[in-house]
């Protein structure tokens, strides 16, 4: 795993952080959906880097020493409460903004990380994103006040787009009769809360193999709610659900909660949920 991160560093991260002549502010986010959001607000006034790059599982992410040295250079860090952030907190001295601070959090009963008290997938909700975009904007204005007009204009545009997105998602799922969703990994609690779904999770909280009791629990859920599809996540829980998919002849649907373009990803999630 460590060799993989060093390889990624040598192939791509060096180029990103090696731009010594740039006068743009260097901004750090924890996962790529927030890279997308910060770039939408900041435009080309900032360089935005993500701790966890695309195609990696944030729940099992490890930081290489060289990568840690590189992220010391940033001037602002937008955090979301993920477990791997604790490693960075000890060595990053820049201003840190907790984007989960003002969110109505869902307790972590069905999510993934035992050491966290809440579900960290807060970006999978247009309502949450409106709060977080405002927090991002205020922090950017404080960091680069010369661009305040641009930041506030882009923030207002994003807020309007989120209102439209919320309406579109509501329309997509409005006629859906199946409101129970079986997922390999509990990533969709906020989306479910916003749009009237109930999330049932296959995976155990500690990522361990399913016990016989777990299998019975999932089988009962499938029967009780007449479920015919299961949501597989790009980075989590696919192995534990494979046997159940075969046994019950279920339709697998692959989603990626960590896709960079969070707006289009929310539409993809809505479409998937509407066709269960």
From Swiss-Prot:
Cysteine pairs bridged by disulfides in the record: none
CC terms in the record's Gene Ontology section: periplasmic space
A Pfam family per the record: ZnuA
GO molecular function terms noted in the UniProt entry: metal ion binding
Predominant localisation class: periplasm
Keyword Signal: yes
Signal peptide span: 1-18
Localization, UniProt: Periplasm
InterPro entries on file: Bact_metal-bind_prot9, Lipoprotein_PsaA-like, ZnuA-like
Keywords: Metal-binding, Periplasm, Signal, Transport
Entry's Gene Ontology BP terms: cell adhesion; metal ion transport
Residues bound to a divalent metal cation: 59, 121, 185, 256
General function of this protein: Part of an ATP-binding cassette (ABC) transport system involved in metal import. Binds a metal with high affinity and specificity and delivers it to the membrane permease for translocation into the cytoplasm.
Record-stated family: Belongs to the bacterial solute-binding protein 9 family.
Protein name as catalogued: Putative metal-binding protein CT_415
Source organism: Chlamydia trachomatis serovar D (strain ATCC VR-885 / DSM 19411 / UW-3/Cx)
């Amino acid at each position: 795993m460590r060799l993989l991160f060093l390889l990624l560093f040598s192939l791509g991260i060096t180029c990103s952080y090696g731009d010594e002549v740039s006068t743009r502010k260097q901004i750090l986010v924890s996962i790529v959906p927030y890279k997308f959001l910060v770039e939408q607000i900041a435009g080309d006034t900032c360089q935005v880097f993500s701790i966890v790059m695309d195609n990696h599982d944030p729940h099992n992410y490890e930081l290489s020493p060289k990568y840690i040295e590189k992220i010391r250079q940033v001037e602002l860090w937008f955090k979301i409460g993920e477990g791997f952030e604790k490693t960075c907190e000890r060595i990053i001295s820049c201003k840190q903004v907790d984007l989960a601070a003002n969110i109505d959090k869902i307790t972590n009963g069905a999510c993934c990380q035992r050491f966290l008290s809440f579900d960290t997938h807060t970006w999978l909700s247009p309502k949450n994103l409106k709060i977080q975009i405002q927090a991002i904007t205020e922090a950017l204005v404080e960091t680069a006040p010369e661009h305040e007009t641009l930041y506030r204009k882009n923030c207002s545009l994003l807020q309007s787009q989120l209102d439209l997105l919320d309406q579109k998602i509501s329309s997509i799922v409005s006629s859906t009769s199946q409101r129970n969703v079986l997922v390999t990994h509990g990533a969709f609690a906020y989306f479910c809360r916003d749009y009237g779904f109930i999330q049932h999770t296959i995976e155990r909280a500690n990522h361990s193999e399913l016990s016989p009791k777990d299998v019975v629990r999932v089988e009962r859920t499938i029967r009780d709610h007449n479920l015919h599809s299961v949501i597989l996540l790009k980075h989590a829980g696919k192995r534990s659900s494979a046997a159940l998919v075969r046994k019950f002849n279920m339709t697998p649907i692959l989603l990626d909660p960590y896709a960079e373009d969070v707006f289009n990803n929310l539409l993809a999630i809505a479409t998937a949920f509407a066709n269960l």
